[in-house]
């Protein structure tokens, strides 16, 4: 991540919500979904381990998959409807 401006703005809201959308949660599941196709948007948490998020961000850039940073793992986990943090998640079709 280059600057704070790269953090997802949550569409003018202070929260991110994926309810009603098909979501893949977690780095392993996300990598599998990226290989299989059908990923619409990838999100990664700024406070997640760069060893996890770095390769995901690079894959997205190399394969023209939309990518955005989220402020924290807790925010991303809540958006996905889980009670724990998530390093990465994706909206899928």
Over which residues does each language-model region extend?
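A short linear-motif detector with a strong N-terminal bias
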Residues: 3, 21-23, 45-47, 66-71
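Short, flexible micro-motifs
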Residues: 29, 40, 80, 84
